[in-house]
UniProtKB/Swiss-Prot annotation:
Belongs to the herpesviridae alkaline nuclease family. This is Alkaline nuclease. Interacts with major DNA-binding protein; this interaction increases the nuclease processivity of the alkaline exonuclease. GO terms for cellular component: host cell cytoplasm; host cell nucleus. GO terms for molecular function: DNA binding; endonuclease activity; exonuclease activity. HAMAP family: HSV_AN. Its EC number is 3.1.-.-. It comes from Human herpesvirus 2.
């Protein structure tokens, strides 16, 4: 066995390193936790279901090693501890945005642990100005004050330090329970955090996800997205994911008044698509809880507790590898614990759905000369696959694009097909170039089949809408349509999968793209709320508990035409590229901030930051 490294001793140079790997830092945070600590004994069962400590191992006492089972040999310290001895010690408590030490969660006197039934949802949607000013950029500049090199700060450690500092500010403002900041930091720290891989990201990141489920209506959601790379700001080149050099200032302003009519159509009708999905197609993970053992598990999402369109909504979740990437999923079918945390059962598949509402099919029934209107009438009369394809092709840029076998699609449309029944002379002869990763994803998804649910004309007398059977007698039509890996919608789902996988690697992911087609209302339909009813043989909550007993289409929402549910296949190897490139982007930005320091003001100017964010919805 090699002798333990002594403080101050030089470490041998690494053998040949991958030129694409990030530069060495004193405190790497890319190692698996098992690599650093070795196996851990199974934690004891909590005395109450869903106790916060049941999700993550408890932190060891300060200054003591993270002990294992009795008789187990002491684990060696992380190499980062010995490497760091030549420089200033990394603070082992959260820092304020200005770089000063915050309250030590272990040693300083303070409030007791929070109420056992604390909930992240208690945070109001509106934040005071002084909290809106606490951006990640400002915090990062403050962290640079106390180090001799920018490489002393790792991306995951910096993000968690920021999140801890922010919850302390929320606590000081009376917006969360007293003692919650101390409690979350204890859960986060697995060992002296001079080594960033020695922290557990889920306590803090899960807290903020649960607190921001209102998304655009929540100012905390907007604040957390500042300095966070999302699917809308991540670019894709021939070599894979590309992080902008301006990632630290992304998502600084979200203005509703700048959004297009197509975006507003999506905002209004996403709840419609959610209602249809849970009413007819997808079982809820929060329904049917009757036994006493699980009685307290679904505090957030008990049946009837929320409006149907908010069931299984998600806030912003940051990746647990580097904290650089964030995603706000439309729908994640996953139970939650009493505090609101996502709490899937081990090795249980996680189905999630990205909803897209296609405004270009929202024709006006009062215009009988519109090609889409006449194609819709034919579809309602015949209900055949041929009539459905004719309706899809009734607009100038159809929402399903054909490309020939052996070729690749362009990036224009989110749904594509190679089936000759969809052959379109306008696209049959196209030749497109494609990167190797995208081509592999096209081949991976080419065998996927979508499910199409068709809806009939509203019954004005009974004020109901229901699915209708196809001409074949089946209620759900299977069509050889798959998600286009070259389209931004696919990339968005890929990023969401990366973030989820970083927290729940043992749960197989089941991503889907949901496409809602709806039309404007006819004169007699204006102002009417329609109740959703089952059609003949309609599925009720397939794959889980039955769908909600009551669901409606509100007067401002479109009349549904069809719902297309498309499974998505992703190659997990791409996740490694995202992780590696996010670290490189962080290191590059820190180097620039370090080089731009004012000589007379220390390592960084912490008060240099952008304006506070404004709430609003953007593509996630």
């Amino acid at each position: 066995m090699a002798a333990a490294a002594t403080p101050g001793a030089k470490r041998p140079a690494d053998p040949a390193r991958d030129p694409d790997s990030p530069p060495k830092r004193p405190r790497p945070n890319s190692l698996d936790l098992a690599t650093v600590f070795g196996p851990r004994p199974a934690p004891p069962r909590p005395t109450s279901p869903g106790a916060p400590g049941s999700h993550w191992p408890q932190s060891p006492p300060r200054g003591q090693p993270d002990g294992g089972a009795p008789g187990e040999k002491a684990r060696p310290a992380s190499p980062a501890l010995s490497e760091a001895s030549s420089g200033p010690p990394t603070p082992d408590i959260p820092l304020s945005p200005g770089g000063a030490h915050a309250i030590d969660p272990d040693c300083s006197p303070g409030p007791p642990d929070p109420d056992p039934m604390w909930s992240a949802s208690a945070i109001p949607n509106a934040l005071p100005p002084h909290i809106l000013a606490e951006t990640f950029e400002r915090h990062l500049r403050g962290l640079l004050r106390g180090v001799r090199s920018p490489l002393a700060i790792g991306p995951l450690w910096a993000r968690l330090d920021y999140l801890c500092s922010l919850v302390v500010s929320l606590e000081a403002a009376g917006m969360v329970d007293r003692g919650l900041g101390r409690h979350l930091w204890r859960l986060t720290r697995r060992a002296p955090p001079s080594a960033a891989e020695a922290v557990a990201p889920r306590p803090l990141m899960g807290f903020y996800e649960a607190a921001t489920q209102n998304q655009a209506d929540c100012q905390l959601w907007a604040l957390l997205r500042r300095g966070l790379t999302t699917a809308s700001t991540l670019r894709w080149g021939a070599q894979g994911p590309c992080f902008s050099s301006q990632w630290l200032t992304h998502n600084a302003s979200l203005r509703l008044d700048a959004q297009s009519s197509a975006v507003m159509f999506g905002r209004v009708n996403e709840p419609t698509a959610r209602n249809l999905l849970f009413r007819y197609c997808v079982g809820r993970a929060d329904a049917g809880v009757n036994d006493d053992a699980d009685a307290g598990r679904f505090v957030f999402h008990q049946p009837g507790d929320l409006a149907e369109e908010n069931v299984h909504a998600c806030g912003v979740l940051m990746d647990g590898h580097t904290g650089m990437v964030g995603a706000s999923l439309d729908i994640l079918v996953c139970p939650r614990d009493p505090h609101g945390y996502l709490a899937p059962a081990p090795q249980t598949p996680l189905a999630f759905y990205e909803v897209k509402c296609r405004a270009k099919y929202a024709f006006d029934p009062a215009d009988p000369g519109a090609p889409a209107a006449s194609a819709y009438e034919d579809l309602m009369a015949r209900r055949s696959p041929e009539a459905f394809r004719a309706f899809i092709r009734s607009i100038p840029n159809p929402g399903v694009r054909y490309f020939a076998p052996g070729r690749v699609p362009g990036p224009e449309e989110a749904l594509v097909t190679q089936d000759r029944d969809w052959l379109d002379s306008r696209a049959a002869g196209e030749k497109r170039r494609c990167s190797a990763p995208d081509r592999a994803l096209v081949e991976l998804n080419s065998g996927v089949v979508s499910e199409v649910l068709l809806f009939g004309v509203p019954d004005l007398e009974r004020r109901t809408i229901s699915p209708v059977a196809w001409s074949s007698g089946e209620l759900v039509r299977r069509e050889p349509i798959f998600a286009n890996p070259r389209h931004p919608n696919f990339k968005q789902i890929l990023v969401q999968g990366y973030v989820l996988d970083s927290h729940f690697p043992d749960c197989p992911l089941q991503p889907h793209l949901v496409t809602f087609l709806g039309r404007h209302r006819a004169g007699a339909e204006e102002g009417v709320t329609f109740r959703l009813e089952d059609g003949r043989g309609a599925p009720a909550g397939r794959g889980g508990a039955p769908g909600p007993a009551k669901a409606s289409i509100l007067p401002d929402q479109a009349v549904p035409i069809a719902l297309i549910i498309t499974p998505v296949r992703v190659e997990p190897g791409i996740y490694r590229d995202i992780r590696r490139n996010s670290r490189l982007a962080f290191d590059d930005t820190l180097a620039k901030l370090w080089a731009s320091r004012s000589p007379g003001r220390g390592p960084a100017a912490a008060d240099t930051t952008s304006s506070p964010p404004t709430a609003g919805r953007s593509s996630r």
